[in-house]
Design a protein with these regions (language model features):
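Short N-terminal or domain-adjacent regulatory/targeting segments
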Residues: 30-64
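Alpha-helical substrate-recognition element adjacent to the catalytic core
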Residues: 269-270, 274
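Alpha-helical cap/lid subdomain in secreted, periplasmic
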Residues: 2-10, 15-28, 35, 59-68, ...
Length: 274
């Protein structure tokens, strides 16, 4: 029964990928490793799938619609995110050559014209940042000015990166944390960090236009659950701002946005014949 489910289950995909890997059928091992992207959001399975895909793709001709150079300019540990994005992108026919900024050096990499980021000559710069990077007070007497200043800070980074390279920008916006000092009162206080963070997200969306693509991490964190999105254990142990369990979801949506930027999104015409 598992063999005819659509999509196949995560354990089945992983079992088949490993079986084909053992017998040396590299193309089928790749196919089933990539099927894990559609099967669910199990981080351990995705990690195993990426290892299997990497090993077998080197030994067979694996077609890719596009090859793209992506630079992750991150404010937290992005090693795991990079692997997950590459797996999700491979599933939709994109081969990613990856550069990762050193931990927390995203601003320095973007500001310095001689940085390794620009030497890499990326097609896409992915700003993988989190709510803790916002220069916002817990409460502001002038929230409009503070929000505008913060929006301008991020758009200045966009403009600098596009001026010093030909790359498009993909920006992760900011997931509002579930622990808020002012609690339910925050929604009544325009100057609370909670409300200003949402205003920054709205401002970035308005400023992006057609030049910058936004991955809506605030929506994704609500989809998976705020307590699953951020786990303080991972932050304290390895400065991982997005919990490992949430990385597959974030990677899938990031890869989809990259595909759309490359013109690889799919159109579907649905006709109701009733």
């Amino acid at each position: 029964l598992d063999a005819v489910t659509s999509p196949p289950s995560t354990p089945l995909c992983l079992k088949l990928a490993r079986s084909y890997d053992r017998i040396g059928n590299h193309a089928e091992a790749c196919r089933w490793a990539l099927s894990l992207v559609d099967a669910g959001d199990d981080y351990a399975a995705w990690q195993a799938g990426w290892t299997l895909f990497q090993r077998n793709a080197q030994r067979t001709v694996w077609p890719a619609a596009r090859t793209v150079k992506v630079a992750i300019a991150g404010s937290y540990t992005t090693t795991q995110l990079g692997a997950m994005v590459r797996l999700a992108a491979a599933r939709i026919g994109i081969r990613i050559d990856l550069y990762e900024s050193p931990y927390g050096q995203y601003q320095q990499d973007i500001i310095d014209p001689a940085s390794n980021l620009y030497a890499f000559a990326p097609d896409i710069v992915l700003l993988a940042v989190h709510e803790g990077d916002l220069h916002l007070a817990e409460f502001s007497p002038d929230p409009a000015e503070e929000v505008q200043r913060e929006v301008s800070r991020w758009t200045a980074l966009w403009n600098l990166a596009t001026t010093l390279s030909r790359a498009r920008i993909v920006q992760h916006n900011f997931a509002v944390p579930c622990d808020i000092p002012t609690g339910h009162l925050a929604t009544r206080l325009p100057g609370s960090r909670y409300m200003m963070t949402q205003a920054v997200n709205t401002g970035l969306g308005a400023a992006a236009g057609t030049a910058v693509s936004i991955v809506d991490c605030e929506r994704l964190s609500a989809l998976i659950g705020k307590q699953r999105w951020y786990d303080p254990r991972y932050w304290n142990l390895s400065k991982q701002a997005v919990a490992l369990d949430a990385l597959p979801l974030l990677a899938r949506h990031t890869a989809a946005v990259i595909a759309a930027d490359l013109g690889l999104s799919r159109k579907c015409l649905v006709l109701d014949l009733d």
